[in-house]
Amino acid sequence: MAKLYFTYSAMNAGKSTILIQSAYNYRERGMEVMLWTSAHYGDGAAVEQAEISSRISLSAEACGFTPTVDLFTQVRAAASKTPLHAIFVDEAQFLSRDQVWQLSRVADQLGIPVMCYGLRTDFQGKLFEGSAELLGIADQLREIRTICHCGKKATMTARLDESGHAQTAGKQVDIDKQHYVSLCRRHWEDVTGLHPG
C-alpha cells in the first residue's frame, strides 16, 4: 500500500539534497517519478516549470505549485500518460491543507507513494499550514537532523536581517535579503527573545 511521507527539519539540513538523490535512485532503476516544488511567488492555478536546488549545487527540474493547483488532478493526469512510481514534493510547508489531502488521495486512491520534504516551523516557532497538516495525517514522519552552533540538535530556525539581528515579526514567508540559521531551542530563544505559548 502506498503511503504519504513527511520528512521535516530546520533549515539547511539537506532536505532537497536527499529528495534529489532519492528521485535519482528511482530513475536509475527505470522508474518514473514526478517532482514538485513551491512556485510560492507565482500566481494563478497554472502549473509552472520550476527547479529544486540544494545548497551543494544539485538540482532537478520540477513542476511548481501555487496554493490553488489541484495536485491530485495534476498527478492523475500525468499518471494516465506514464505510470508513476513516486511523487516527490519539496518545500512542502507551503502546501495548503487541501493540497496535503490531495496528496493523501494520490497515495490512497492512485497507489503512488508521496514523499514530502519541508520545514516544520517558521522563524517565529509556528507551524506552517502544510507542515501542520502533514504532521497530522502523514503515514510516516521522518526527521532530518542538523546541528546548532553549540553542537546540540537544531530544531528551530531564526531569520536574521542584513545586520545579523534576529527578526521576530513579519510575514511568514519573505523573499527579501534574509539569512536563516538553524538553532537549538535554547539558542533560538536567546537570539529571538520569543517565548511562544
Regions from the PLM with identified roles:
Residues M1-A78, D122-E133, E143-T146, Q167, ...:
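Conserved P-loop
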Residues A92-L103, F123-F128:
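Conserved ATPase-coupling elements of RecA-like P-loop NTPase cores
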Residues A107-G130:
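Sensor-1/coupling segment of RecA-like P-loop NTPase cores
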Residues T146-V173:
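Short recognition patches in nucleic-acid-associated and regulatory proteins
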